[in-house]
Amino acid sequence: MSKRILILDDNQDILEIVHETLAYEKFDVKSTSNGEDVMPLVAEFNPNLVILDYRVAGINGGDLCKQIKCHPQYKDIPVIIFSAYINHDDELMGYGCDAIINKPFDLTELVDKVNGLIS
């Protein structure tokens, strides 16, 4: 059975590229551009990994990461945060994420991080 990945990014181009790249790598991928959709999708889709953009309209990826990591049922799901903010890694790690990928990023780096976290 394919590993499931949930992606949040409000940049449609990035969302599509990441979705297509991970689907090509044989992952079962769901994506959304709305932060309010994340927790219901986590409950419904039961992902093996979540990728969150740090800055999205409404609830940000850091706060969503905290919600996932504080929930008894979801706390062990690895979370990657995308960020365009260089030199904020300590702040981002404070949300409990398992990895940070700075934008712009290399798709090979993304796939390697994903594989490392869910293998």
Regions found by a protein language model. Name each.
Residues Q12-K30:
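Two-component/phosphorelay signaling modules centered on CheY-like receiver
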Residues S31-L49:
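Acidic, metal-coordinating helix/loop segments flanking the phosphotransfer/catalytic sites
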Residues S33-N34, N60-K66:
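Acidic catalytic/metal-coordinating carboxylates
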Residues D53:
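Active-site residues of response regulator receiver
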Residues V56:
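Receiver (REC) domain active-site loop signature in two-component systems and cognate sites
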Residues F105-V114:
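C-terminal output helix
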